[in-house]
Amino acid sequence: MIVQYRLKLKGPEGRPLSNTWAYRLYAWLLEQAPEEFAAFAHRQENRCLSQYLDGNVWVLNLLGREAAEVFGSVLEKTEKISLNNALMQVEESCCRVVEKPEDFLNRGRELHCLRSELRFRSPTAFRQAGRYAIYPETGLILQSLLAGWNQLYPEYLLEDGDMLAELKGGINI
């Protein structure tokens, strides 16, 4: 299950939000969740939440039923967010749900795309041999994406070596 929330925020004193607010919003969300789940969600190996700011719209992707329930219950009732003595109003919110992997795959087929584009909307780090990679290679990006997919949809594991090599060969940075 993938649930995407889009919250249109009115910044402090009506000012536009810069991307630097994204991590503070993420920290605020973790503070609203039960402590054990917040710690679980924050660990690097868990891929249950991704978020970024797109202008004044806070976009959150909740991956898996538990994240959707825990964080969704917080986001559904949020009207105001107070951060560092700054108050933000939620002007609008919407939610999209992809319940089953088949829905996700069928949506991709509907787009009739020969290419896909991946944008990193917030700082992204990759690790190799226990160290952060300054410049991630296509293999690290693909490995991260597939690990997230396999964690979310274990019934559709993507681990065929030939497929991975073909995907890696077709990725350009």
Q: What is each PLM-predicted segment?
A:
Residues 1-173:
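RNA-interacting cores
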